[in-house]
Curated annotation (Swiss-Prot):
Pfam family, one: Pep_deformylase
GO MF entries: metal ion binding; peptide deformylase activity
Protein name, per record: Peptide deformylase 1
Species per Swiss-Prot/TrEMBL record: Pseudomonas putida (strain ATCC 47054 / DSM 6125 / CFBP 8728 / NCIMB 11950 / KT2440)
Record's keyword annotation contains Iron: yes
Encoding gene, per UniProt annotation: def1
UniProt keyword Zinc present: no
Length: 168
């Protein structure tokens, strides 16, 4: 297994649309394992393949404290089950150190495939619903900062660019 490099906002590669997975092979399983290792090391609770510059529809997630609930979503789609919105404070491994409130539907249904290509459905609410929507957005080139005002987005971008210059 390997720790993968996580792209950071405003890297334009984060805006790339992910392509559907068509081959469920050892290379895909290795990517999934590497993504989990990268996510746990960061540390985070979700990671989309787009964030590690692999533009395939793959998401890994684990909301547990002890890494006991790893979830894999391949070729996912999400459907709102309610128009009721909730506000959660979101952060992102691609936007390190920044947390902002984002409004999202409180309940969703996910259709996806597991690491072996087997289809499944899952109804989600609360933090799981938020995380699913956040990570699936990545597959469509969207970041949580896109839900913020232009002013907040620009401020975050400038701070991250300054950090990158200082690290260089």
């Amino acid at each position: 297994m390997a720790i993968l490099n996580i792209l950071e906002f405003p890297d334009p590669r984060l805006r790339t649309l992910a392509k559907p997975v068509t081959e469920f092979d050892d290379a895909l399983r290795q990517l999934i394992d590497d993504m989990f290792e990268t996510m746990y090391e960061a540390p985070g609770i979700g990671l989309a393949a787009t964030q590690v510059n692999v533009h395939k529809q793959v998401v890994v997630m684990d909301l547990s404290e002890d890494r006991s609930e790893p979830r894999v979503f391949i070729n996912p789609s999400v459907e709102e089950l309610t128009h009721d919105m909730g506000q959660y404070q979101e952060g992102c491994l691609s936007v390190p150190g920044f947390y902002e409130n984002v409004d999202r539907p409180l309940r969703v249904r996910v259709k996806a495939q597991d690491r072996d290509g087997k289809p499944f459905e899952l109804e989600c609410e609360g933090l799981l619903a938020v995380c699913v929507q956040h990570e699936f957005d990545h597959l469509n080139g969207k970041l949580f900062v896109d839900y913020l005002s232009q002013l907040k987005r620009d401020r975050i971008k400038k701070k991250l660019e300054k950090q990158h210059r200082q690290q260089a």
